[in-house]
């Protein structure tokens, strides 16, 4: 008798994706982050669902409903902090996952890479809207500042901002629609993630060497399921440590003050995972220029396959490109630090230098270095 997992129409799909999937035998722990992202997404949807049962999307009661969740709801505090810190874990895994794709040349799978970029943008939009929901000072002013950036759009800017706000300022209409979008977007992300996986399984996984692994593949289960469980254990250990011992470490103290349109916080800044883009935005004195740089800081990822001039796919055997990659990583960490600093000397100058370096590495230095390495291969 044939095994049901190989014949049943529905179970067969799961079998071909997670059990009998032919996988390269040499993929390292950097390939763990796909499954970790899936886990983070499920965790966020579940905790978010329970939070939505008690949350009120009204300007007069949103802040107190969060307080009620933490004080009165059974284990509400852990659900709230798991959701908040789960978002940080999500972005940490996202950045590592994207970095791995860049390092090992996974961007040559165009459909998978482009859907990944759409996923990144969607997750960023979802996280931004989620940050507005507690209706603290940083929620309100963050929403005001970021949505106001759209007013830089020529001709239709002001109308666009007022359309998004649902009025002439960030108010009840804005909060209600942000809650609606924040609820629906994770399910869209889930659909996109499935499509991402579908396209990946069309071509098969990349591997650290960057060469075809068709001659040497092993089944996903039990080899990589056990390997993924190790990564998952470490992720949950890190998340639970953060949630139970340092729940407010990554948050902003200003968000424990109810939103007040008449009182502006001294330093308006988003969550840590947006700081690199926020630093790029602030480094350009012109409003429209800053907004374009902000958008390009993410959309530049779509150009990476076009800028790939190397004869080798992976950076594993290209030391000069490796150096540039780690300089880029350090540059992003510098931008993250600058984004959290006040707009004053010397932070402005450091931010501008780091922003120029960020775009220069991707657009100019990486393709040039790859061409030099191609020449060196002939020697």
Swiss-Prot record:
Any one GO molecular-function label of the UniProt entry: metal ion binding
Disulphide-bridged cysteine pairs: none
Residues the entry annotates as binding heme b b566: 97, 196
Gene Ontology CC annotations of this record: mitochondrial inner membrane; respiratory chain complex III
InterPro entries cross-referenced by the UniProt entry: Cyt_b/b6_C, Cyt_b/b6_C_sf, Cyt_b/b6_N, Cytb/b6-like_sf, Cytochrome_b, Cytochrome_b_C_euk/bac, Cytochrome_b_N_euk/bac, Di-haem_cyt_TM
Gene3D superfamilies per UniProt: Cytochrome Bc1 Complex, Chain C
Pfam families in alphabetical order: Cytochrom_B_C, Cytochrome_B
Cofactor(s) it depends on: heme b
Membrane topology annotation: Multi-pass membrane protein
GO biological process, one term: mitochondrial electron transport, ubiquinol to cytochrome c
Keywords noted in UniProt: Electron transport, Heme, Iron, Membrane, Metal-binding, Mitochondrion, Mitochondrion inner membrane, Respiratory chain, Transmembrane, Transmembrane helix, Transport, Ubiquinone
Miscellaneous comment in the UniProt entry for this protein: Heme 1 (or BL or b562) is low-potential and absorbs at about 562 nm, and heme 2 (or BH or b566) is high-potential and absorbs at about 566 nm.
Subunit structure: The cytochrome bc1 complex contains 11 subunits: 3 respiratory subunits (MT-CYB, CYC1 and UQCRFS1), 2 core proteins (UQCRC1 and UQCRC2) and 6 low-molecular weight proteins (UQCRH/QCR6, UQCRB/QCR7, UQCRQ/QCR8, UQCR10/QCR9, UQCR11/QCR10 and a cleavage product of UQCRFS1). This cytochrome bc1 complex then forms a dimer.
Protein name: Cytochrome b
Organism: Daubentonia madagascariensis (Aye-aye)
Lineage: Eukaryota, Metazoa, Chordata, Craniata, Vertebrata
Gene: MT-CYB
């Amino acid at each position: 008798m044939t095994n049901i997992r190989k014949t049943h129409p529905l179970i067969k799909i799961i079998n071909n994706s997670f059990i009998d999937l032919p996988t390269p035998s040499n993929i390292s722990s950097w390939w763990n982050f796909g499954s970790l992202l899936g886990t983070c997404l499920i965790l966020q949807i579940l905790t978010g669902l329970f939070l939505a049962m008690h949350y009120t999307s009204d300007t007069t009661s949103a802040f107190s409903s969060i307080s009620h969740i933490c004080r009165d709801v059974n284990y509400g505090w852990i659900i709230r902090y798991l959701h908040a810190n789960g978002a940080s874990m999500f972005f940490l895994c996202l950045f590592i996952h994207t970095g791995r794709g860049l390092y090992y040349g996974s961007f040559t799978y165009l459909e998978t890479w482009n859907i990944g970029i759409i996923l990144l943008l969607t997750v960023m939009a979802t996280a931004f809207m989620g940050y507005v929901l507690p209706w603290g000072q940083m929620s309100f002013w963050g929403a005001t500042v970021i949505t106001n950036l759209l007013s830089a759009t020529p001709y239709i800017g002001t109308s666009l901002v007022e359309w998004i706000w649902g009025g002439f300022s960030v108010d009840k209409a804005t909060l209600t629609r942000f809650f609606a979008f924040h609820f629906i977007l994770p399910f869209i992300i889930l659909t996109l993630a499935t499509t991402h996986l579908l396209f990946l399984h069309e071509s098969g996984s990349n591997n650290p060497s960057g060469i075809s692994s068709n001659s040497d593949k092993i089944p996903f289960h039990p080899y990589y399921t056990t390997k993924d469980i190790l990564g998952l254990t470490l992720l949950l250990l890190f998340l639970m440590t953060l949630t139970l011992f340092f729940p407010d470490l990554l948050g902003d103290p200003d968000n424990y003050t109810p939103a007040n349109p008449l009182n502006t916080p001294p330093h308006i800044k988003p969550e840590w995972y947006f700081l690199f883009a926020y630093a790029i935005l602030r480094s350009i004195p012109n409003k429209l220029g800053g907004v374009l740089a902000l958008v390009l800081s993410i959309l530049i990822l779509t150009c990476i396959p076009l800028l790939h001039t190397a004869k080798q796919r992976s950076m594993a055997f290209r030391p000069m490109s490796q150096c540039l990659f780690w300089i880029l990583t350090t540059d992003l960490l510098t931008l993250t630090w600058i984004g959290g600093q006040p707009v004053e000397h010397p932070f402005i100058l450091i931010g501008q230098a780091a922003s120029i370096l960020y775009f220069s590495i991707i657009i100019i230095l990486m393709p040039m270095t790859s061409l030099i390495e191609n020449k060196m291969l002939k020697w």
